[in-house]
């Protein structure tokens, strides 16, 4: 993990960064558009909800968490034959990091709708992409990328927000007001009082004690369903029908 893009490609040790075959790239090439890239070009930015599926044909591209902030860091660097993105590309969530060109090259941009059509015709190709995206999401969760949740471990609302993130496999970092020294710095940066907590920082936006529905909308997830009312039923009588 570094704070500035390197030209060295990140090794694929877990299967999260597979390289597509020439045949797979050719199939995608028929459905997409080639684009030249220059160092510093942003292919998609954190928070973007509409992005193409990018395959690197030449050059290298870095996945950058927190681009433009003091906490900016490089998650991975990809070279020829690798594809970009993670699970959010398929779920409609805002992107959890930015993709930034490290050096000059060329990428293939395929609309997500066309990608879905290819996946439907080639299940093995779909399995490759889905497995890689699931592993990438796990990496983000392990790194504490994505959301920042600031709140007390004694707060029921803090537990609710953290449970929501965990249920939806969202990458997040929890800053405990009682134990994490950086929580105070974040609170001061955004002018947050203890009464405002828990707060959630998502794609640069501050949410004060958001409901699950508000948090879902900010992320790009469908609104969570309301809990169904339940009641007891009493059956009175006897006999085979129980009536």
Where are these regions (language model features)?
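Cytosolic regulatory regions built on CNB/CRP/Popeye-like sensor folds
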Residues: 1-151, 155-163
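Structural micro-motif
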Residues: 189-201
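Beta1/beta-strand and adjacent pyrophosphate-binding region of the FAD-binding site
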Residues: 227-241
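Non-catalytic, surface beta->alpha helical segment in thiol-disulfide oxidoreductase systems
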Residues: 203-224
């Amino acid at each position: 993990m570094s704070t500035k893009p390197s030209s060295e490609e990140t090794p694929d040790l877990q299967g999260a960064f597979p390289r597509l075959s020439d045949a797979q790239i050719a199939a995608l090439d028929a459905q997409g558009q080639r684009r030249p890239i220059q160092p510093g070009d942003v292919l998609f930015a954190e928070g973007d909800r509409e992005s193409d599926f990018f395959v690197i044909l030449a050059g290298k591209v870095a996945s950058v968490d927190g681009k433009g902030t003091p906490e900016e860091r490089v998650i991975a660097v990809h070279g020829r034959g690798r594809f970009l993105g993670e699970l959010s590309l398929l779920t409609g969530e805002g992107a959890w990091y930015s993709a930034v060109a490290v050096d000059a090259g060329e990428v293939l941009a395929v609309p997500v709708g066309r990608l879905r059509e290819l996946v439907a015709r080639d299940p093995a190709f779909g399995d490759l992409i889905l497995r890689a995206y699931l592993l990438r999401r796990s990496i983000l969760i392990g790194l504490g990328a994505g959301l920042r949740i600031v709140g007390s471990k004694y707060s029921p609302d803090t537990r609710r927000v953290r449970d929501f993130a965990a249920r939806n496999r969202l990458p997040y970092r929890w800053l405990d007001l009682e134990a994490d020294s950086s929580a105070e710095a974040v609170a001061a940066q955004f002018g947050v009082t203890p009464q405002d907590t828990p707060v959630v920082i998502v794609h640069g936006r501050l949410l004060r004690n958001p409901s699950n529905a508000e948090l879902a909308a900010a992320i790009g997830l469908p609104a969570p369903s309301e809990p169904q009312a339940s009641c007891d039923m009493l059956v009175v009588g006897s006999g085979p029908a129980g009536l």
